[in-house]
Amino acid sequence: MTKLSKRQQMIFDFIKSEVKLKGYPPSVREIAVAVGLASSSTVHGHLERLENKGYIRRDPTKPRAIEIIDLEMEQQLPKDEARYAPVIGKVTAGIPITAVENIEEFVPIPSSSAGPDDNVFVLVIDGESMIEAGILDGDMVIVKQQNTAVNGEIVVAMTEENEATVKRFFKEENRIRLQPENATMEPLFYDNVTILGKVIGLYRNIH
């Protein structure tokens, strides 16, 4: 790979640290603040050069869609720092679909993403209702199994129609609001939902 300038290296290191810490890449604004740049267009220019040099891959149609090319999941997790979680069916982040409760495969996740006694599973996102939270169509979300949630948390919820969906959870005075992270989509309202777990991370294959 072509050598990076000092500023490009700062941006690349920040993106890597955010992906490792949060499971998804930072926004252009967050990058600008982190490395001391005032202009979003300057950040875009550096990202373009990082892409041309083979360090990242971007999808211009999706926000936050920055993939670190050298961060293949298998490579970034040393054997003693990884655990394996089952991929259970598929959950739609858009139009809910009935959850399929069978294990399709196992994938490595960071041991630091959950405690040793936590039950975790992975679900595949099908849809674009959470793109503004950095959760894209085809991503695998890492979910800590629990039956409670705090307002504002991203959860996997089973609706009254026994369909599962990934949304941001809000308990209001007399209803539950499941809020998409997509300005083009409306919230969903229910008298009651069953919380299956809280999203604690994200697994993204790099193709």
UniProtKB/Swiss-Prot annotation:
**What are the BP-aspect GO terms?**
DNA repair; DNA replication; negative regulation of DNA-templated transcription; proteolysis; SOS response
Q: Using the chain's own numbering, where are the disulfide bonds?
A: none
The catalytic activity, as recorded, is:
Hydrolysis of Ala-|-Gly bond in repressor LexA
The site feature described as Cleavage is recorded at A93, G94
Q: Which InterPro entries match?
A: ArsR-like_HTH (IPR011991), LexA (IPR006200), LexA-like (IPR039418), LexA/Signal_pep-like_sf (IPR036286), LexA_DNA-bd_dom (IPR006199), LexA_repressor (IPR050077), Peptidase_S24_LexA (IPR006197), Peptidase_S24_S26A/B/C (IPR015927)
Q: Which domain of life is it from?
A: Bacteria
One GO molecular function term of this record is:
DNA binding
Question: Any idea what job this protein has?
Answer: Represses a number of genes involved in the response to DNA damage (SOS response), including recA and lexA. In the presence of single-stranded DNA, RecA interacts with LexA causing an autocatalytic cleavage which disrupts the DNA-binding part of LexA, leading to derepression of the SOS regulon and eventually DNA repair.
Similarity remark: Belongs to the peptidase S24 family.
Under what name is this protein listed?
A: LexA repressor
Question: What is this organism's lineage?
Answer: Bacteria, Bacillati, Bacillota, Bacilli, Bacillales
